[in-house]
């Protein structure tokens, strides 16, 4: 039965509308980040119009593409306006990233200040509203064209399908990271990974709070036997946090950063080692380490690729070795990142049961696990001894 014509929109309808119309507004986030609109608004320090923000931007950065001008015909007059900044600031206000005041005036709020004070968060926002939004736009098209072939496999996701349909045949065969490298986006992504959207404390603090006895593990091991291998460790922030917490135990030779990311650069405080675990013939080069770490690595991988990587680590683990995995707890709070991993990487966040299945396929068993309602879970695996 149709609702009466004069009936107000029900709360459920408002919820649906406000949620599904987010995507177009999110498309403006990269503009705000690219032109540092959050930083400009915060530095102004008081309510400001879009023109005020543009003027401040010009003073700080000089002439940029922000100043492309639109001429609007209004009756018999032409008005010169900058619609890019005005619409972008308005939509950032709609998303809650700044405050909307009457008469097209904008003001920094707590979210604005967080974005300015946490540069990695702005780079993360750019990533999910660029690569992530592109992939989501082509999800249904990819499914329909393949008769709903699912789950996706690595390098064959809606992200690659988007590039295929746009005529970028070379990029359509590449991994997301390779595409970001070729398009100049990888350095931004690496910056995101150093701090993400903010973290509580250091890695030792976080695992300690969840009940994992990292202190006891390191202190009960002879110094000459301590080696920590961070697989896919980016710019080494996890190892550097461990070094700062245990300076008497962890020196450069104890800390091994394994990466194949082309834009990482030099991390002088740790031992850098290239390892592309994607290559079938490339085995884990460090045997018998005390601790192998994977932080936000496996959620980028499909189950098949995860098992391959876990097997490579399992084969070189000693009976005393630990594999420590840190990912988001899979629940409603992480459902959006779960979707992002599926669409861009064919990966996923995982539950305890899913981690146990992966471990079993790789000859490993879970010996510690903790799943907080928000933030990172911690899963320790050890080799199954026959």
UniProtKB/Swiss-Prot annotation:
Keywords: Methyltransferase, S-adenosyl-L-methionine, Transferase. S-adenosyl-L-methionine binds at residue 200. One of its GO terms (molecular function) is O-methyltransferase activity. Its EC number is 2.1.1.-. GO terms for biological process: methylation; secondary metabolite biosynthetic process. It holds the Pfam family Methyltransf_2. PROSITE patterns: SAM_OMT_II. The active site is at residue 299. It is an enzyme of class 2 (transferase). Pathway: Secondary metabolite biosynthesis. PANTHER family: PUTATIVE (AFU_ORTHOLOGUE AFUA_4G14240)-RELATED (PTHR43712:SF18), PUTATIVE (AFU_ORTHOLOGUE AFUA_4G14580)-RELATED (PTHR43712). O-methyltransferase; part of the gene cluster that mediates the biosynthesis of aurasperone B, a dimeric gamma-naphthopyrone. The first step in the biosynthesis of aurasperone B is the production of gamma-naphthopyrone precursor YWA1 by the non-reducing polyketide synthase albA, via condensation of one acetyl-CoA starter unit with 6 malonyl-CoA units. Belongs to the class I-like SAM-binding methyltransferase superfamily. Cation-independent O-methyltransferase family. This is O-methyltransferase aunE. It comes from Aspergillus niger (strain ATCC MYA-4892 / CBS 513.88 / FGSC A1513). The gene is aunE.
